[in-house]
Amino acid sequence: MKSNFSKFKDFIKYKKVAVVGIGVSNRPLIKFLVKLGAKVTAFDKKHREKLGSISLELEEIGVDLVLGENYLDKLDGYDVIFKTPSMRIDRPEFVKAKESGAYITSEMEEFIKYCPAKVFGITGSDGKTTTTTLVYEMLKKEGYRTWVGGNIGTPLFANIEEMKEDHMVVLELSSFQLMTMDVSPEISLITNLSPNHLDVHKDFEEYVWAKKNIFKYQSSNNLLVLNKDDDLTNGMENEALGDVLKFSLVEKVYNGACLSNNKLTIQGKEVCDSKDIKLKGRHNIANLLAAFCMVNKYVSIDSMKYVATNFSGVEHRCEFIREVNGIKYYNDSIASSPSRTLAGLNSFEKPVILIAGGYDKKIPFEPLAEGGYDKIKILILMGDTKNKIKSAFEKVISYKKCEMEIVIVNSMEEAVKVADNMAEKGDIITLSPACASFDMYPNFEIRGNEFKNIVNSL
């Protein structure tokens, strides 16, 4: 049962509130809390000069600022602390604050708790953004007033009073956001699971545990959608508290969605033929099947079909850039894990020239090497993980007794130049890093945009 937002308004008024992080996504939250009558202090590691005009803007509305390297040392004495998702709750500063009586939460937890609209939550290792967007587009096509947020779109908590019971909200949720969650969306999906973010999570078990929070607090009339082709997610059916629908690319599924004789079906009803889908790759057929399961109760087959046959994809996801001298360039900068890169490689009909490497999330690259060695013509590596990926591939090349040229480069510009020089007419060059971007870029979008700019200048 959803709580009325008036309870939160009564609770937060006059409270001493700390908001950790003054990034773009937290700024609407800070301003909203001030509007609700809270006494807000905003914390950030950056100094005033780095933050720019936002520091003055916040001070003008009465927000106190705690800035600099040791900013978390001053979390004592607050009634409520809104933490940024990527910060672990077991940090000593948070543990101490909680022991002193602080209520530690996050924007997303409070949003799901009080949102009057029906909430669709999507998580998983790969396919989250595309599936979130597909669900959003299908609901919108059906005529619902639909909001999208979480890891994509805009922060929604500040707009909660505009939302109605007959609205729909679609959220992409990361393991970081879910780790401390004690509330679940009414309709939840786990797309798939593979090792990821092990630079933040203690181990893979903790990562999986965090993902399960998306359905752990559901009720009997809620829905959980699971991937039947993924052993980990398929086995979660036994832990479900409500209804379960499954999707599969390889098995017939009657209580869910599947690919049968090249037809995409939901509950035995045909939606469309796979040849009519604009999205590239089998992994995107899986994303569509998952979306069908989520919206089945609310959306007509016609609306599902329209989106499935017209939606051409989200930027930075197997995105075709251009063809130059018979060479095709694709931007798959979203691929920040080996499994996502492997899915991208599988969407091409021939071996490609792959540009990969980046920030080290402490995840193994052996599965990428073993599953992808025969799908790569030339491997161009950059970033912190370049030698780690090279080592994984060299082992596979050695015992498979196959050949693959591996080139180490120091920049995106050099990577594209090398790829372009080595490519022949008919080749495909794709940026699909298998790693996060943080060693060289603030995010995957900026990484992808630089790649596109370089390719477009060829």
From Swiss-Prot:
Any one GO biological process: regulation of cell shape
Alphabetized UniProt keyword annotations: ATP-binding, Cell cycle, Cell division, Cell shape, Cell wall biogenesis/degradation, Cytoplasm, Ligase, Nucleotide-binding, Peptidoglycan synthesis
E.C. number(s) listed in UniProt: 6.3.2.9
Subcellular locations according to the entry: Cytoplasm
Coiled-coil parts of chain: none
Pathway: Cell wall biogenesis; peptidoglycan biosynthesis
Catalytic activity annotation: UDP-N-acetyl-alpha-D-muramoyl-L-alanine + D-glutamate + ATP = UDP-N-acetyl-alpha-D-muramoyl-L-alanyl-D-glutamate + ADP + phosphate + H(+)
GO molecular function: ATP binding; UDP-N-acetylmuramoylalanine-D-glutamate ligase activity
Pfam families: Mur_ligase_C, Mur_ligase_M, MurD-like_N
Keyword Hydrolase tagged: no
The organism's place on the tree of life at top rank: Bacteria
Residues that coordinate or bind ATP: 124-130
Gene Ontology annotations for the cellular component aspect, listed alphabetically: cytoplasm
Function: Cell wall formation. Catalyzes the addition of glutamate to the nucleotide precursor UDP-N-acetylmuramoyl-L-alanine (UMA).
Family: Belongs to the MurCDEF family.
Record's protein name: UDP-N-acetylmuramoylalanine--D-glutamate ligase
Species name: Clostridium botulinum (strain Hall / ATCC 3502 / NCTC 13319 / Type A)
